[in-house]
Design a protein with these regions (language model features):
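SF2 helicase catalytic motif II
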Residues: 1-35
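Short regulatory helix/loop adjacent to the ATP-binding pocket of P-loop NTPases
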Residues: 3, 41-61, 164, 217
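Conserved Walker B
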Residues: 4, 11-13, 101, 159-160, ...
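Structural recognition of the conserved hydrophobic beta-strand(s) that form the central parallel beta-sheet
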Residues: 8, 31-37, 46-47, 97, ...
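Conserved interdomain linker/interface between the two RecA-like ATPase lobes of SF2 helicase motors
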Residues: 51-115
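C-terminal helicase module of SF1/SF2 nucleic-acid helicases/translocases
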Residues: 77-93, 110-303
Length: 303
């Protein structure tokens, strides 16, 4: 792109490091704007290192109603389904999210099995399945019927995570929620918190989920703030390689940890900017430059 001046990457959390890098390499001098309701941990870590400047919009869009999130143990699923049946019978609409499309995927709840479970409690209300494999024409028909109130519940995969704007939807159930990242779950919650009515999300947690997974999901019970969720995700997953391509896990920092040492990182960032912008060519600074180059020698540098 000879005249590319601005690259905007929306829903940034859905792209891999190398995908973003290839795009930016087409015009190295272009300005880049990355947008996300929930920054992934690596992105949050880069803000502390100075690669990204951050603008935080900490207000909800006007007209949004209250939203609550509740974690539900797997053994209470039947009671939850009865409650959902009453809600949908009263006119509520919503989504039931599963981690698998087909049966037999490592014991995961699939959309066909889930539809059978919820149908027992929804009476005459219509239930449809929506996945990435659903033909385009059928997908449009389902979404249109849902928007018109003809469908009570859509059983789906994460295909509804973005781009689904149905203001009347007020109910979300995520089965085996421990299988999803906090970013995904927060994005899915946004599908049912788009109008003035109160909305609710239920996160069904498997018996096999460990204490770590349960603690992670409880973050969503306490906040609807995307940036706070990203910071918690950073603590649970780690920021990934700040100079590499891994997007989660513990970074190879020698003397600090994120986010615990954020203040130290910001101080180092300010010092580095001061040196670079001041065109420092002192022997001390050159020694630091060579030291950093030595630490990253042989690594894939994509930042």
């Amino acid at each position: 792109f000879k005249n590319l001046d601005l690259v905007i990457i929306d829903e940034e959390q859905r792209f891999g490091v190398l995908q973003r890098t290839r795009l930016l390499e087409k015009a190295p001098q272009a300005n880049a704007l990355v947008v996300s309701a929930t920054p992934i941990p690596r992105t949050l870590a880069l803000t502390a290192y100075g690669d990204l400047d951050v603008t935080v919009i900490d207000e909800m869009p006007p007209g949004r109603g209250r939203h609550s999130t509740t974690c539900v143990p797997e053994e209470a699923r039947d009671n939850l389904l009865r409650n959902i049946g009453r809600m949908v019978a009263s006119g509520a609409q919503g989504f039931y999210i599963c981690p698998a499309v087909e049966k037999g995927e490592a014991g995961l709840m699939d959309v066909t099995t889930a539809r059978g479970l919820v149908r027992r409690h929804l009476g005459s209300r219509r239930v449809e399945i929506l996945t990435g494999r659903t033909p385009s024409a059928e997908r449009c028909r389902i979404v249109d019927d849902f928007r018109l109130g003809r469908i009570g519940l859509i059983v789906a995969t994460t295909v509804i995570e973005v781009g689904m704007d149905i203001p009347a939807a007020t109910l979300l159930v995520v089965d085996q929620a421990e299988r999803f990242g906090l970013s995904q779950l927060h994005q899915m919650r946004g599908r049912v918190a788009r109008a003035g009515a109160e909305s609710v999300s239920y996160l069904v947690v498997s018996e096999s989920a460990g204490e770590h997974a349960s603690d992670r999901l409880k973050v969503l019970e306490s906040t609807f703030d995307g940036f706070e969720i990203a910071e918690k995700d950073l603590m649970f997953r780690g920021p990934g390689d700040v100079v590499g391509i891994r997007q989660h896990g513990l970074p190879d920092l020698r003397f600090a940890r994120l986010p615990e040492d954020t203040d130290l990182m910001l101080a180092a960032r300010d010092e580095a900017f001061g040196r670079v912008l001041g065109d420092d060519d002192s022997a001390e600074w050159q020694l630091w430059v060579e030291t950093v180059r030595g630490l990253t020698q042989g690594e894939v540098i994509v930042v």
